[in-house]
Amino acid sequence: MTDNKKTLVFATANRNKLIEAAGVLGKGFALELPADWGYTNDVPETHFTSRENAIEKAQFVWEMFGKDCFADDTGLEVDVLDGAPGVYSARYAGEPKNPVQNVKKLLRELEGVPFAERTARFRCVIALIERGPEGCEGLPEESEAMAGGEAVPGEGAAMAGGDRGIALPGGGILRVFEGTCEGHIALEPQGELGFGYDPVFIPEGMEKTMAMLTLDEKNAISHRGKAMAMLAAYLGRDEL
């Protein structure tokens, strides 16, 4: 790790996510995991929206270690299933988390649904917490910003409070970014790359599933790639 790199703790135990994030953020960042600081359990996610879960996970790491950090929460939303599996994507088939069984359950529930009606999207919300300047005067407080469950105002936009962010206890500043990827659910799994639902998700305008794309190809169009690119742009990188 070199001094000119910005160090961020990524609030996840999923090293596949870490690899994707590092591929987008580039060499100007050193990414660490909670496990690198001795925390080896899953980071809590107890809410009902991706936005709330991402914020919860980032705050958990911020409060535990006091280090600049970010968290993502990603869900697959299938229109004909009324947005399911959504925030339950990682545990769709129950505990413990089993990506293969999740995919099998999804395909069972879509049995008989024609391809044209299997529209879906991946949604990724990233919450970033950085140590702010002394005082953070003029920023909305966390309680003010969270009241009423105010939505992220747009893809990649900072959450309530605009570019200034939201002041957290302990001197942190919270900002939220969001990316989506539209597509369809395939009739059967295809491809060996990626993880999760990648083998059955065909991005809009493509004929391949995400599991058939290289990491660079995936990052260029994926929900997480878009959200990470917004995060990188905010953090001041010119090269993504």
Regions found by a protein language model. Name each.
Residues 2-9, 16-240:
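Anionic-ligand binding patches
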